[in-house]
Structure formats: structure tokens, C-alpha cells
């Protein structure tokens, strides 16, 4: 059973609050970040997270669910083609709210809500066997690396010789002047 939210609503009526949250979510997906009040940022965050979670799997049902909230087809396309696939390995926490101080006119606390674009760091291995396997693959990768710098050093050797020759020529030119 739906329960009313406690305290004052954003914009006055529940319908106006829903419209405000829809517009904030749309602008967030279109621009990547939105500067708004802390209260609005905290209220739009769960809605944005829910929509991004739906956008991770591109199905007709998920597109219809998102279209109920965001009516602009261009923004829905951005959500499903850019933002959703980028969050594929992440299990929540798609947005970040950062406080930026107070607004000059009315001293309202302001915040920036943004879609996180950082890559997901690989998780730590769960067991000791996984840790050993990860270490083994890392050492194999390090053993393969020295071959490439040897080729680079051979390619850079003629360049270094040319630079030394140029320095010798410069020193020879300086001696007659002194």
C-alpha cells in the first residue's frame, strides 16, 4: 500500500513532485550531471539508480518501463546505448551526490548529482586458490613484458647515437668562438 512521504513535498503536490523528479532524471542522463539542491539530489538518486539498473539489459519491457518515466526518446536512447552498457559490471552506486556549498540568493544547500563514469575495479579474490591464480597470471604477464622494451631499446639506440653526434657538433662549434 503506498504511503505518503513525510514532510513537505518538492513543489507542493505529489504530481508536481513526480514531474520535478522526472525532469531532473532526464537532465542527469542527458548532461551527465545536474546542479540542484541537496534535497532534490537525494530524492532523484533512487529514481536514477532504478532507471540505470533497467538500462543495463536492453529488453522491450525495460524500455517500456523507462519510457513511463522519461518521455524523451533521445534520452532513453542515450540511457540504453551509453550509460547502461558502461555500468554493466557495477552492482549499484551509479550516481554520486557531492555537496558544493550554499546558493547565494537564498542560502539553500546545493549539490551536484552525477553519473559515475569510473571503471569498476576488479574485486579481490574470494579464496586463497583464486589469489594464487591471480598472482600466477600477473607474473606471467611480467615475464612477457621485458621482450617488448628490448625491441624499443634497439629502435631507440640509433636515435641516441644521433643525439650524441649532434651534441659533439655543437661543442665543436662553440670551441672556435671562445
From Swiss-Prot:
Name the Pfam families for this protein.
Answer: Ribosomal_L17
- The residue ranges flagged as biased composition, category Low complexity, are 123-139, 151-160
Please give the SUPFAM superfamilies that the UniProt record associates with this protein: Prokaryotic ribosomal protein L17
Listed GO MF terms:
structural constituent of ribosome
GO biological process, alphabetically ordered: translation
Q: Where is the composition biased (Basic and acidic residues)?
A: 161-178
Q: Which domain of life is it from?
A: Bacteria
Species this protein is from: Cutibacterium acnes (strain DSM 16379 / KPA171202)
What family is this? Answer: Belongs to the bacterial ribosomal protein bL17 family.
Instruction: List the GO terms this entry assigns under cellular component, sorted alphabetically.
Output: cytosolic large ribosomal subunit
Q: Where is this region: Disordered?
A: 123-178
UniProtKB keywords: Ribonucleoprotein, Ribosomal protein
Listed under subunit, the entry gives:
Part of the 50S ribosomal subunit. Contacts protein L32.
Can you name this protein?
A: Large ribosomal subunit protein bL17
Amino acid at each position: 500500500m503506498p504511503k505518503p512521504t513525510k514532510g513537505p513535498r518538492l513543489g507542493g503536490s505529489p504530481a508536481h513532485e513526480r514531474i520535478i523528479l522526472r525532469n531532473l532524471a532526464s537532465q542527469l542522463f542527458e548532461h551527465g550531471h545536474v546542479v540542484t539542491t541537496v534535497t532534490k539530489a537525494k530524492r532523484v538518486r533512487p529514481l536514477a539508480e532504478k532507471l540505470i539498473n533497467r538500462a543495463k539489459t536492453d529488453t522491450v519491457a525495460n524500455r517500456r518501463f523507462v519510457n513511463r518515466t522519461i518521455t524523451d526518446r533521445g534520452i532513453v536512447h542515450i540511457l540504453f546505448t551509453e550509460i547502461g552498457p558502461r555500468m554493466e559490471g557495477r552492482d549499484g552506486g551509479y550516481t554520486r551526490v557531492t555537496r558544493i556549498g550554499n546558493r547565494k540568493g537564498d542560502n539553500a544547500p546545493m549539490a551536484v548529482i552525477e553519473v559515475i563514469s569510473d571503471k569498476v575495479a576488479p574485486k579481490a579474490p574470494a579464496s586463497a586458490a583464486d589469489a594464487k591464480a591471480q598472482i600466477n597470471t600477473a607474473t606471467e604477464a611480467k615475464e612477457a613484458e621485458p621482450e617488448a622494451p628490448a625491441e624499443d631499446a634497439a629502435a631507440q639506440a640509433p636515435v641516441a647515437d644521433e643525439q650524441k653526434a649532434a651534441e659533439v657538433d655543437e661543442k665543436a662549434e662553440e670551441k672556435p668562438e671562445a
